């Protein structure tokens, strides 16, 4: 259980949020950049998978298969983490010529996290609310909760990176 909390929640989701907000703060002065309609192959995959995720989660929830819904959400989180590694925004930030690509990547990350937060809302409402807050979304946007379509993250939104949303648990076996 401790390992699952540390890996799935802390490493996969918590680090994704924290890394993304840190990069938006560092490279875009804390403002979600305008993506100017650009979409790379990897970006198109994120959009396509988010639509597929919507169908998968809807089907699982309709059939009361909550663990299947969570599995689908975590598969998407894994894809977004892979997107970070493939896109290497920290490398893109070093060259002025790749600024548009950097903006696309950071927008896609913020939008993916917004969508993830909406999917986890029924399972972890407090975590989803904190993610919305750190993404700079207003309570109205947070309660709108049904806007799971790609493109709901408004460029120009000021992010508010807080403390990591999950703390690491230590396990000690007593003799």
Residue ranges and their predicted role:
Residues 1-9, 52-71:
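Extended, non-catalytic structural segments that build the interaction scaffolds
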Residues 59, 63-65, 74-175:
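Basic, alpha-helical terminal appendages of large translation-related enzymes
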């Amino acid at each position: 259980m401790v390992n699952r909390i540390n890996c799935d929640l802390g490493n996969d989701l918590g680090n994704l949020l924290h890394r993304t907000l840190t990069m938006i703060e560092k490279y875009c002065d804390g403002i979600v950049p305008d993506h100017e309609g650009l979409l790379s192959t990897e970006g198109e995959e994120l959009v396509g998978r988010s639509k597929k995720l919507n169908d998968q989660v809807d089907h699982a929830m309709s059939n009361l298969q909550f663990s299947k819904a969570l599995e689908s959400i975590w598969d998407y989180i894994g894809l977004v983490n892979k997107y970070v590694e493939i896109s290497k925004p920290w490398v893109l930030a070093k060259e002025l010529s790749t600024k548009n690509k950097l903006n696309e990547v950071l927008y896609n990350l913020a939008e993916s996290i917004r969508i993830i937060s909406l999917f986890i809302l029924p399972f972890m409402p407090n975590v989803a609310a904190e993610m919305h807050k750190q993404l700079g979304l207003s309570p109205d946007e947070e309660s709108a909760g049904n806007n799971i379509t790609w493109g709901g993250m408004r460029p120009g939104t000021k992010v508010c990176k807080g403390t990591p949303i999950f703390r690491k648990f230590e396990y000690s076996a007593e003799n």
